[in-house]
């Protein structure tokens, strides 16, 4: 959702991908969260999960069984949002010809844009579509849900300290909902990037997606699921971005090269851009904003893409040591670079030129993200601005390292982070850019 902006260690499996950085910042690559057990009445045990990922503590994270089974009631879910639009995944390497043909027909950016339009329309129509709040039901299960949300907050505080701090400005309901989404994203990420990633299979991800369906249907399995189930029953959050994130996990099991930026764009949407679409309905749009809903959602998507592209550029050497290249292969070829140049870590003039182009692209997405960030509810802006400013500085550090991202890890020094956080807070207090733009037009 941030001492480096993130810390990283090698994954324990060749199928592991890098830790995906999304709108959440300060997410160290520690292996798993030790989740405290909370005593609830026992229920019949469910079918065994497809894997068991355990941390140094007594409880696993990142797999289907995490805490005690949830026996409390959950608020009835919202009616299904109409018109779900699925974004088809790129094919594995052996289907590259089919992938190229499909990409030529409908570019990934257009497919993702269609999803953004759908999400924006659903959010705009949400007040008319939502079921009346079940206040009595919420009060009846408040005790158990409070414990669930508190645990989500503990996980967020431990693994995303700066992001957690920034959420303190949000209203309690929004803050807790963001924590619940963060925890689900982290658990999903651990499926293919955790200590048991070598045992992960497509079937396990299918079961995780089935469990997601249960969450949205108001049938949570454990306390962390219950927190998310309550969140999606309270806010107009659509299931499709969650499904698409799982699709990104599937991609990491089968694909280690990306032929073009079109392919890479879709991957970045899956593992990072989706988070923006998940969280905007919770963060809300400022009542003063004069921007259309689509602009805000496109900005949230752009921040996820920018963060992920930055993450990719920072971790080129680390990924190469795992046999992975998350760079557009056609652009590498046009720059006169080969896979051997990547695996050998050659910092040449050609590499510097190539990296300058990649950094320029990432910065363009950051600029687009600024447009959406300023339109959010004021109390929700600080964590978004913190993510944007801190991650953008990683690009500066790559340049400062003379584009050596093979053996040098770019990170934001603590002093710069300290300066960036109040700057992010100041930006969060400014009027939406759409209001400032209109004011400048009327005064001129």
UniProtKB/Swiss-Prot annotation:
Keywords of the record: Carotenoid biosynthesis, Chloroplast, Isoprene biosynthesis, Membrane, Plastid, Transferase, Transit peptide
Expression induction or repression: Induced by drought stress, salt stress and abscisic acid (ABA) in roots.
EC assignment: 2.5.1.32
Subcellular location, principal: plastid
Family, per entry: Belongs to the phytoene/squalene synthase family.
SUPFAM superfamilies the record matches: Terpenoid synthases (SSF48576)
Tissue: Expressed at low levels in roots and leaves.
Compartments where found: Plastid, Chloroplast membrane; Plastid, Chloroplast, Plastoglobule
Keyword Plastid: yes
Name the UniProt record assigns to this protein: Phytoene synthase 3, chloroplastic
Recorded catalytic activity of this chain's protein: 2 (2E,6E,10E)-geranylgeranyl diphosphate = 15-cis-phytoene + 2 diphosphate
Function statement: Catalyzes the conversion of geranylgeranyl diphosphate to phytoene. Mediates the first committed step in carotenoid biosynthesis. May play a role in regulating carotenoid flux in response to abiotic stress in roots. May control flux to carotenoid precursors that are required for abiotic stress-induced abscisic acid (ABA) formation in roots.
Transit peptide start and end: 1-54
Membrane topology classification: Peripheral membrane protein
Top enzyme category: transferase
One GO MF term attached to the UniProt entry: squalene synthase [NAD(P)H] activity
Recorded GO CC terms: chloroplast membrane; plastoglobule
InterPro entries linked: Isoprenoid_synthase_dom_sf, Squ/phyt_synthse, Squalene/phytoene_synthase_CS, Trans_IPPS_bact-type, Trans_IPPS_HH
Organism domain of life: Eukaryota
A single GO BP: carotenoid biosynthetic process
Pfam families assigned: SQS_PSY (PF00494)
Keyword Transferase carried by entry: yes
């Amino acid at each position: 959702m941030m001492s480096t902006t993130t810390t990283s260690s090698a994954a324990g499996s060749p199928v592991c991908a890098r830790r995906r950085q999304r709108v959440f910042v300060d997410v160290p690559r520690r292996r798993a969260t030790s989740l405290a057990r909370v005593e609830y009445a026992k229920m019949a045990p469910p079918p065994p999960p497809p894997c068991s990922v355990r941390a140094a503590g007594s409880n696993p994270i990142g797999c289907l069984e995490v805490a005690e089974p949830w026996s409390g009631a959950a608020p009835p879910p919202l009616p299904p949002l109409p018109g779900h639009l699925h974004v088809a995944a790129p094919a594995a390497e052996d289907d590259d010809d089919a992938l190229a043909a499909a990409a030529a027909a409908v570019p990934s950016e257009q497919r993702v844009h269609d999803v953004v339009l759908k999400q924006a329309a659903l959010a705009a129509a949400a007040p008319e579509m939502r079921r009346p709040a079940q206040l009595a039901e919420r009060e009846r299960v408040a005790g158990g849900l409070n414990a669930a949300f508190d645990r989500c907050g503990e996980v967020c505080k431990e693994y995303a300290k700066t992001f957690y701090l920034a959420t303190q400005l949000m209203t309690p309901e929004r803050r807790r909902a963001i924590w619940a989404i963060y925890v689900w994203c982290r658990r999903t990420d651990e499926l293919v990037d955790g200590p048991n990633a070598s045992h992960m299979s497509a079937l396990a991800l299918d079961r995780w997606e089935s469990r997601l369906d249960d969450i949205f249907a108001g049938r949570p399995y454990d306390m962390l699921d219950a927190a998310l189930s309550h969140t999606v029953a309270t806010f107009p959050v659509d299931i499709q971005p969650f499904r698409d994130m799982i699709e990104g996990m599937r991609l990491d099991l089968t694909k280690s090269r990306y032929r073009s930026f079109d392919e890479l764009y879709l991957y970045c949407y899956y593992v990072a851009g989706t988070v923006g679409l998940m969280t905007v309905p919770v963060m809300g749009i400022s009542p003063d904003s004069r921007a259309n809903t689509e602009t805000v959602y496109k900005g949230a998507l752009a921040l996820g893409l920018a963060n992920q592209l930055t993450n990719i550029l920072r971790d080129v050497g680390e990924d190469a040591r795992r046999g992975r290249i998350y760079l557009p292969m056609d652009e590498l070829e046009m720059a006169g670079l080969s896979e051997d140049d990547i695996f050998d870590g050659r910092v040449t003039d050609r590499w510097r030129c190539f990296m300058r182009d990649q950094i320029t692209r990432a910065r363009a997405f950051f600029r687009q993200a600024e447009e959406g960030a300023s339109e959010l509810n004021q109390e929700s802006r600080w964590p978004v601005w913190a993510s944007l400013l801190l991650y953008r500085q990683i690009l500066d550090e790559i340049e400062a390292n003379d584009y050596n991202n093979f053996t040098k890890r770019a990170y934001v020094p603590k002093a710069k982070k300290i300066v960036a956080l109040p700057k992010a807070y100041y930006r969060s207090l400014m009027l939406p850019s759409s209001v400032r733009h209109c004011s400048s037009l009327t005064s001129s």
